[in-house]
Regions:
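Dual-mode signal for accessory low-complexity, basic/Gly-rich regions
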Residues: 12, 27-206
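Active-site pocket-lining segments that scaffold enzyme catalytic pockets across diverse folds
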Residues: 1-24
């Protein structure tokens, strides 16, 4: 769940957008999630490691909506990428001791759903409960997505047995527009993302 939202955030990174290597290019104002879901960045959450009042370039951080009710609102930028995009920096520069500033996200939360993970499994009926992801192959220009995975086989809404050495594939744009969140997000970590039910993924494995 966190990795899927992480791939989305990578596509909203101003450096990738400025290079033209984002599958969300030209998508500001477009529908990218179900209409009841938002992604909010809050750099002021107490006792969370990614909280900070200023970014690495000395600009004040702010609470902002990256996605508002399914609509993409904003890129994530530092001074360099914002100049290239003719925008104002969102105050998201980060850097290491010997590296140049790059855009990065602070604390992120995705709107919680109304059902538990168990209820979503019953809604799914038959499918896979993914618990671990391995490697990745993502086309940054198209959003085509393929990753190794392991987890549990689910039948009639009930977990049956563990499975591994699977490959799951799809297109991130389609996957994200169909997600249904559970209500189990952990509130004490930097990325508050619940379990996600996703339809239409291709699964391969023996």
């Amino acid at each position: 769940r966190q990795s899927l939202i992480g791939h989305f955030l990578s596509a909203t990174n101003g450096a990738a957008v400025a290079r033209g290597t984002s599958w969300l290019l030209n998508s500001i104002g477009s529908v990218v999630l179900p209409e009841n879901l938002s992604i909010i960045e809050d750099p002021y959450r107490p006792r969370v490691s990614s909280s900070r009042p200023f970014d690495a370039e000395g600009l004040e951080t702010k609470i902002r909506k990256i996605v508002d009710n399914g609509i993409l609102c904003d890129w994530t930028t530092d001074l360099s990428s914002s100049r290239k995009l003719d925008l104002k920096s969102t105050g998201n520069a980060t850097r290491g001791i010997g590296s140049i500033p790059m855009p990065s996200n602070w604390n992120i939360s995705l709107t919680d759903g109304t059902k538990s993970q168990s209820e979503l499994l019953k809604d799914m009926g038959c499918g896979i409960l993914v618990t671990s992801m391995i490697g990745s192959a993502i086309n940054p220009n198209t959003g085509d997505y393929s990753r190794g995975a392991s987890g549990f086989w689910v039948e009639n809404g009930e977990v049956q047995y563990p499975i591994s050495e699977l490959t799951i594939a799809g297109n991130l744009s389609h996957m994200l527009r169909t997600i249904i969140p559970a209500n189990d997000a952990r509130q004490y970590i930097s990325r508050v993302v619940p379990s996600l039910l996703i339809d239409g993924i291709t699964i391969a494995g023996s």
